[in-house]
Amino acid sequence: MVDVGSLSKGMYIKYEGEIYRVIDVNKHFRARGSGLIRTKLKNMSTGLVREVNFNSGEKVEEAEITFRKASYIYNDGEKYYFMDNETFEQYGIPVSDIEEEKNYLVENTEVDLIMHDGKPIGIQLPTSVVLEVVETEPGFKGDTVSGGGKPAVLETGLKITVPFFVEKGQKVRVDTRTGEYIERA
């Protein structure tokens, strides 16, 4: 059991018989009273996000999950398929379970499969991935003064802002937590 005051973003808990990932935590403390912990929880089996309020001092069960190294191999429109790097077993995860992560997946991307009771319930991406720019406007000399950027579409369909010197066909490193450009790869 874990005290709700120690909940943090990214943790997995068991609440009302279901496995949830903590998406957001806000702690509010009232004068002379107990605190209120407001959370956003994503149900790992349905993908639905719900807001749950806890009083400080309450306890929740931490979910028993394990991580397995795997590689993304392909998708068939309904599921994304991953191969376990040790056993070579293939796992299919529905698109709805990895809605946010799918924009960073290209063939052979190394991920951690999040497992519960021997079944995959989601994936954890590396902190950054390298993706190819497939569409962007040409840069102009002198635009570097503003320090801004220009829109670009990457090979997975992800839209980000890149510096003016990045051109179509180049590979860029993208932070998977924020979706922002890091550097040219």
Swiss-Prot record:
Function: Involved in peptide bond synthesis. Stimulates efficient translation and peptide-bond synthesis on native or reconstituted 70S ribosomes in vitro. Probably functions indirectly by altering the affinity of the ribosome for aminoacyl-tRNA, thus increasing their reactivity as acceptors for peptidyl transferase.
GO cellular component terms attached to this protein's record: cytoplasm
Cross-referenced NCBIfam families: efp, PRK00529.1
Gene3D superfamilies: 2.30.30.30, Nucleic acid-binding proteins
Keyword Zinc part of the UniProt annotation: no
Entries under Pfam families matching the protein: EFP, EFP_N, Elong-fact-P_C
GO molecular function, one term: translation elongation factor activity
Pathway: Protein biosynthesis; polypeptide chain elongation
UniProt GO BP: peptide biosynthetic process
Family note: Belongs to the elongation factor P family.
Major subcellular location class: cytoplasm
UniProtKB keywords: Cytoplasm, Elongation factor, Protein biosynthesis
Protein name: Elongation factor P
Subcellular location: Cytoplasm
Gene from which this protein is expressed: efp
